[in-house]
Amino acid sequence: MANKEYPLAKFRNIGIMAHIDAGKTTATERILFYTGKTHKIGETHEGAATMDWMEQEQERGITITSAATTCFWKDHQVNIIDTPGHVDFTVEVERSLRVLDGAVTILDAKSGVEPQTETVWRQADNYKVPRMVFINKMDKLGADFLMSVGTLRERLHANAVPLQLPIGAEDSFSGIIDLVKNDAIIYKDDLGTVMDETEIPEDMKEMAEEYRTMLLEAVAEVDEDIMMKYLEGEEISVEEIKTALRKGVLANKIVPVLCGSAYKNKGVQLLLDAIIEFMPSPLDIEDVKGTEPTTGEEMTRPADAKAPLAALAFKIATDPFIGKLAFTRIYSGTMKSGTYVFNSNKGKRERIGRLVKMHANHREDVEELKAGELGAIVGLKDTTTGDTLCDDADPIILENMEFPEPVIDVSIEPKTKAGQEKMGIALAKLAEEDPTFRTYTNQETGQTIIAGMGELHLEIIVDRLIREFKVECNVGQPQVAYKETIKKHVKAEGKFIRQSGGRGQYGHCWIEMMPTEGEYEFQNAVVGGSIPKEYIPAIDNGIQEASQSGIIAGYPVINFKVKLFDGSYHDVDSSEMAFKIAGSMAFKNAMSKADAVLLEPSMKVEVVVPEEYMGDVIGDINSRRGRIEGMTPRAGAEVIRAFVPLSEMFGYATTLRSKTQGRGNYVMQFDHYEEVPKSIQDKVIGERK
């Protein structure tokens, strides 16, 4: 089956995404079980799930790296990317969304839409990914299908259209009404393989009728022929409904909603059927866009195995046995093992050692990967996350991925002197795998600092150092990753001259520096050759290096752009080094005039508390410089949404527990950087000295 050729129309590249603990890995496990890939179902709480293949994942029962797995269902090849639901791993979700064609969002029937669901949904909106929703855990206490559908509409503004209704809930959840076919499925056994297709139970006919009418109205909105039939009261066939639904999903106008219990094996095969019926194939999505490396001209590439190669390396992982694996999506063309490809971001040729298709943690060697496929490459040396691989005769750079800045850092040191070098190598490998993880040396103290997206993120990094790389280390207290920026548009000069004996040094430049919302930009506006072309990159490098340490308290400077507009040079004494120093001097001079301010990470916090503790909790959030955004009731509790500076959130879990007698819980995730009040800024500067 695996070696059979599948036409592109029969491919589905989908991601499974959700809030932590919504049952995502369990659902993926069941999909692998029903599609014949696994003979015994792995249970997450037994620590045996096949998709969770890193040791820490099996211990913690959460998914950290997104494994890409190939399986087969009803004559289709389905590539599944399982993504983590914990906020510290948003980057994994971001990278997988970049390479999928469709996504299944899993909700917990008890909670409906949760904060991480919102984050992931927004990320999917950015990439215009068609999606559907599976409301899981229908067998659990407090499961409420209609409430969950309501949260999709209210919190995500999604046009959520139920295609199914559950028969019973909690302990009595026994089957599913299929609104498309207008019949019912009753489960007869625990494995969910024995089921009866019967009529809709009497006591649910009225409700099924009401929801089927809503379904028909939704498909009529996207299909004029159905609209005419519907208005004239004609019968609309099941096939017509399915065709219109597919059209609506692909246009991001309809989000189909299904239900079930992955753990109890109910609803999973129907979910697989729906993935094939309504999710896009690589042919249904727009041709991938990119630019020509030398001219910057926009280009597109079709999903066609005969077109020139265009592929994106979306994840780098280190495998203990075969070394570096580059997970790759082939958008067009064909990649063959043993051949050379061109990495257009690095401008280097790379040799492909082996090509493998992944199944959670076992590999199948293949000779080639074609347009629309996902696989991993062994043997690449210089490729990192987000790089494009293509033909050197036909180069293209696909849109790169942007990753958020780390918000928290800790100092780390090996327990033994011998561990220092080992730790350096290990940290470099981990940083290569994960673009939101950074490691650097603090120039003043000489300490090694690791920075990431949250405490769990860094805990797992330290854990991997010990397990995979056998480096024992001591870890300091978490610190907030402050940044600096400017508020004024200024001009400044950088002049570096040294002419005492021997060869002199001469570099001189004028820059304009201005605040911006986006990433760092460098614009060369020098005319008339006042600075020779070959020295321009050195000025840019000098500015970028100097921006790693701002003038307020030595934190990295962000959100600014630079325009180089003038300067001068000396025929003999000028060098790249001299211009690099001049660039860094110009940067420091500009920053001292540009109203520099300190920025701190502001976190989006969502606290769920029983009503009687609300006053206390809100008072506490206000005392932490929090800004309350709103409150909504949810299942006997109140949900408080607020923005709070990260520096005020350390130890919050303990405070919340004592204020609510253990009944409150919270989640937080990085939202944006904002200016630090003067009094706090002075305190931070004082602590740095």
Swiss-Prot record:
GO terms for biological process: ribosome disassembly. Residues 9-283 form the tr-type G domain. Keywords: Cytoplasm, Elongation factor, GTP-binding, Nucleotide-binding, Protein biosynthesis. Pfam families: EF-G_D2, EFG_C, EFG_III, EFG_IV, GTP_EFTU. One of its GO terms (molecular function) is translation elongation factor activity. One of its GO terms (cellular component) is cytoplasm. It is found in: Cytoplasm. Its main location: cytoplasm. GTP binds at residues 18-25, 82-86, 136-139. Catalyzes the GTP-dependent ribosomal translocation step during translation elongation. During this step, the ribosome changes from the pre-translocational (PRE) to the post-translocational (POST) state as the newly formed A-site-bound peptidyl-tRNA and P-site-bound deacylated tRNA move to the P and E sites, respectively. Catalyzes the coordinated movement of the two tRNA molecules, the mRNA and conformational changes in the ribosome. Belongs to the TRAFAC class translation factor GTPase superfamily. Classic translation factor GTPase family. EF-G/EF-2 subfamily. This is Elongation factor G. It comes from Clostridium botulinum (strain Langeland / NCTC 10281 / Type F). The lineage of its organism: Bacteria, Bacillati, Bacillota, Clostridia, Eubacteriales. The gene is fusA.
